Amino acid sequence: MRSLNYQLKMLCRHSREGSYATQTNRERMLTLIANELHELGYRKMSERSLKPKHIEALVKRWFDQRLSIGTIKNRMAVIRWWAQKVDKQNVVARSNEHYGIPDRRFIADGSK
């Protein structure tokens, strides 16, 4: 297991906030985010080495993968939780507009 994955898993285990489903989903999303950061070339990261360039790279990747706006916003919420837990909440912009993430659209334009 990679160091970042392990550290984020332990962070989730020590910070038991929310329902069991929320805790499980958060842990899975953080594992996914850690794997994506590794694939993007950010190796040897620790839980405290989160920087704006990492977040911008992740958001760009998610837009390139054509993920839905709701999925991106949910992942940003998990990143904000991570940043708050390691006392780096100023690293993540407070608004999704900073990253170019538009508002959710609840009516589909067409079929996926």
Model regions and ranges:
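N-terminal core-binding DNA-recognition domain of tyrosine recombinases/integrases
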Residues: 6-110
